[in-house]
């Protein structure tokens, strides 16, 4: 008798990515099951999800800087591989032409507390209509696209998301928020 939905251990490590593990021979003819995540779920340290084939998968990723990316492998056995699929989402794409333009774009977006991602030579961020319109008005030439957000830029991530100034201003996060742990999500 074969167990179709075995109880899996808690996933605490990222073993590599699909391409590397296939090239090294660690993944051959095993069934590959995937766990779909929204970009903001990939930032969470503790998470429970159901895979495409119905397996309950629990994550406890407590090592510093450990973040799930598209095609990461979290489980390998003789018969099964569990990999991560970061779902594409609506994004704003910026293609700065110079380093000063890149610095200015990142500074301005960061000042609005929006998460930033690198995708090759482009900067991407979750789509938000007011942000898109502001970037257009500021001359950054934003484009709207569907992409996977998985290479987050981090600044002072160990510090969390708090600061103070000699003044106050709105901290609009466009529907995304965290509970003091730096892990962004929407309800």
From Swiss-Prot:
Residue ranges the record marks as coiled coil: none
Keyword Chaperone: yes
Domain of life: Bacteria
Stretches the record annotates as Disordered: 154-187
Compositionally biased tracts (Basic and acidic residues): 178-187
GO MF assignments: nickel cation binding; unfolded protein binding
Cell compartment(s), UniProt: Cytoplasm
Any Gene Ontology CC annotation: cytoplasm
Cysteine pairs bridged by disulfides in the record: none
Pfam entry (one): UreE_N
Xref: InterPro entries: UreE, UreE_C_dom, UreE_N, UreE_N_sf
Family statement drawn from the similarity comment of this UniProt entry: Belongs to the UreE family.
The name this protein goes by in its record: Urease accessory protein UreE
């Amino acid at each position: 008798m074969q167990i179709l939905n075995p109880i899996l251990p808690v996933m605490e490590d990222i073993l590599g990515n699909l391409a590397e593990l296939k090239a090294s021979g660690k993944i051959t003819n095993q069934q590959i099951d995937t766990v779909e995540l929204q970009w903001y779920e990939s930032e969470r340290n503790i998470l429970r999800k159901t895979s495409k084939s119905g397996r309950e998968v629990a994550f406890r990723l407590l090592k510093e800087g450990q973040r799930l990316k598209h095609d990461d492998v979290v489980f390998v056995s003789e018969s099964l591989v569990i990999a991560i699929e970061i779902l594409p989402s609506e994004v704003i794409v910026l293609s700065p032409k110079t380093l000063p333009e890149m610095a200015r774009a990142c500074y301005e977006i960061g000042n609005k507390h929006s998460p930033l991602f690198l995708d090759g030579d482009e900067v991407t961020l979750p789509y938000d209509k007011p942000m898109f319109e502001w970037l257009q008005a500021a001359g950054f030439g934003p484009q709207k696209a569907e992409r996977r957000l998985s290479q987050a830029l981090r600044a002072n991530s160990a510090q969390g998301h708090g600061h103070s100034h000699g003044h106050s201003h709105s901290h609009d996060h466009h529907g995304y928020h965290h509970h003091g742990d730096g892990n962004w999500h929407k309800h």
